[in-house]
Amino acid sequence: VSIVLAATWDPRGELARLERLMPLLRGWYAAQVVTVPGKTDDRLMLCLEALGIQAQRAEPWTTGRYRALEAAVRFEAAHIHYADLDRLIRWAETRPDELRGVLDVLQTADALIIGRTARAMATHPAALQQSERTVNAVFSHLLGQPLDLPAGSKGFSQRAARYLLARTLPEHGLGTDATWPVLLARGGFRLATLEADGLDWETPDRYLTTAADARLQAEAALIYDAAPDHWRYRVDLAHHIITAGLHAWVQPLDLETEGNPV
């Protein structure tokens, strides 16, 4: 196994599900690195350590993705799978064979942008679909290929990961949805893509003992879309991701963390 998992996780009741999945994850990944928010309590950190996971707190939380990638690189595995852990738990639970196949593809590419199938995208609230469609339209146009960037799952070779760490700031946060692919494309890395059904909407799984079914997803999406604040948040987040990606489009590449990326 030559893949290390680099994941971020803001825990919302998924620990028991993660524990059940660890035999699969140990077979798929040479090591598992997980960053959690600074507020995460010591008991949970000890649970992760007992599972063999390298867990670390990220403070501020916006540095979580960078710190996960940074820690994963130290294992010097050939490839790294970055994933939002709540999405990965659902994926491994509901479609393990698909995920295993994606990891095979991941090992053939310097950069793999894993997107959502139309079926997976349709499970998300309209607020997410509409705002993320704008993000994808901007960067699909600029990078000259269809891309689904905010799906929370990407693959990198060791070389690509080190390239990103040298050219991004830890505080990029969710802006890395765009900054990472943009910087890699500008650096001459080819962006491979594939779509997965397993990246359907994970939020309804919170505090459940198993992944939510399609009925629960649909009910949760209606409730989500009924709140104006959710639409405001999603528009603001899309703006943040686009702004970060456009900065990466013009930032100098020859110096480490040049300028003031969002």
Model feature map: region roles:
Residues 108-151, 160:
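Short, flexible, basic/aromatic active-site loop/helix in glycosyltransferases
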Residues 35-44:
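A conserved acidic beta->alpha catalytic loop
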Residues 77-90:
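Short beta-strand-to-loop acidic/aromatic patch adjacent to the donor-nucleotide binding site
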Residues 66-79:
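Active-site nucleotide-sugar/metal-binding loop of Leloir-type enzymes
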Residues 7-28, 40:
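Short, well-formed alpha-helical segments that are part of the catalytic scaffolds
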Residues 174, 178-262:
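C-terminal catalytic/acceptor-binding lobe
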Residues 49-63:
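Conserved donor nucleotide-binding strand/loop of the catalytic core
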Residues 88-122:
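Conserved donor-nucleotide/metal-binding helix-loop-beta segment in metal-dependent transferases, i.e.
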